Amino acid sequence: MKNKTPIQSHYDTSSVFVAVIGRPNVGKSSLTNLLVGEKVAIVTSKPQTTRTRITGVITRGPLQYVLLDTPGVHKPHNKLGKRMDKTASDSIADVDVSMMLFEPYGALNESEMVLVEALKKGGPAIAVINKTDLVKDPADLEARKAELKALGVFDDVYTVSVRDNDRCEELFDALSRYAVEGPHYFDDDAYTDMPEKELVAEVIREKALLYMRDEIPHGIAVVVERFKERPGTDLVDIDVNIYCERESHKGMVIGKGGAMLKKIASAARADCEEFLGCRVNLQCWVKVKSDWRDNEFLLNNFGFKQNSSNR
């Protein structure tokens, strides 16, 4: 990540690269969006919503925070899942500090222990207990903190409630202690390095996850084939292919009389117009690519390329 060309030539500034890690659905993307103050990662109630590493950027005066929101580690069932897990584990070696999120209750699962073991070989890390609004007894929270400290991999344990927008300043202060003096790697007004085409694709996938039954959306890939501004207007033409793995799935994505596809596209168009700041002519087509999640060529072609460590 840090092989980017610096955009400033003086060094009265500093930056901190942070890997946001944890099991699926623990709130990594929600926390990233909250800290950034913009929607850089899609959020749904379904696990494995995040598929690739998403970069969120926050610049506060001389200090720039770069958050790498990673896929939740899980037991992979296909090559896409393996790439998702590798993205999360590789990010630990690519940052100044890892920030691992936990639920306030429940035993640590296998995927969390895999990350804990990876942290033992990586750099510094802090633990963050999310969803503290669910805690009824403060003693439960203290017990959870003690449990996480006993793992021996975290410099400290913090708490946050993304739902209540609580204790974010404490997290900023904690992360700033790992900052490295040097240039900012992004423009001060940037909030992500994700191209607009990828943002559009993610928004469409988010709507599919929100509106469709559990299994089908996870077999969907969204590829923006055309993104073109109409000269002299505030209109952008966007053509999108939505790929699924079965002909039967295609019918479900389209819906009766095209109702489901229209619902997905309409909601996505509204979000796209908001973050692009212009009118959007969004055209979506549904196509079938059998078992694309296990096809290396298609994974690369659809944009699911492996992130490489840059340290």
What name fits each language-model region?
Residues 196-311:
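P-loop NTP-binding site
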